[in-house]
Amino acid sequence: MKNRYIQQFEDAQLKDKSMPTFKAGDTLRLGITIKEGEKTRTQYFEGVCIAIRGNGVDKTFCVRKIGANNIGVEKIFPFYSESLASVEVLRVGRVRRAKLYYLRDRRGKAARIKEVRH
């Protein structure tokens, strides 16, 4: 159980943050702010959300994409990170699991996720 003062501080931190709702299986496009010296730029990372864990300020999510030479790249982001400039849900996936770690072993068409029909 957390101290009530810590809980009040965390609630105040979360009030002014807004994130789109997404779940494991959704394809996301993340804008990450990168500071290089005096300049700042936004780099985009697009992939499938394979896990969401934690709650409150400690909540994180893991995004996986297939990079150059068919090498899988996974990045874990804090949900309320200052470095996340934008989060956009591109596709809503239909999966039956909360953690999609089995996608690490799949290649090509076997790694596809069905899309939710509207």
Curated annotation (Swiss-Prot):
Say yes or no: keyword Ribonucleoprotein present. Answer: yes
Q: Provide one Gene Ontology cellular component.
A: cytosolic large ribosomal subunit
**Please, which domain of life does this record's source organism belong to?**
Bacteria
InterPro entries attached to this UniProt entry: Ribosomal_bL19, Ribosomal_bL19_CS, Ribosomal_bL19_sf, Translation_prot_SH3-like_sf
UniProt cross-references to SUPFAM superfamilies, sorted A to Z: Translation proteins SH3-like domain
Q: Which chain regions cross the lipid bilayer?
A: none
Q: What is one Gene Ontology biological process annotated in the Swiss-Prot or TrEMBL record?
A: translation
Q: Which UniProt keywords apply?
A: Ribonucleoprotein, Ribosomal protein
For this UniProt entry, the molecular function terms from Gene Ontology, in alphabetical order, are:
structural constituent of ribosome
Question: What are the boundaries of the signal sequence?
Answer: none
Family under the similarity heading: Belongs to the bacterial ribosomal protein bL19 family.
Q: What does this protein do?
A: This protein is located at the 30S-50S ribosomal subunit interface and may play a role in the structure and function of the aminoacyl-tRNA binding site.
The cross-references to HAMAP family, in alphabetical order and at most eight, read:
Ribosomal_bL19 (MF_00402)
Protein name per Swiss-Prot or TrEMBL = Large ribosomal subunit protein bL19
Q: Which organism is it from?
A: Helicobacter pylori (strain J99 / ATCC 700824)
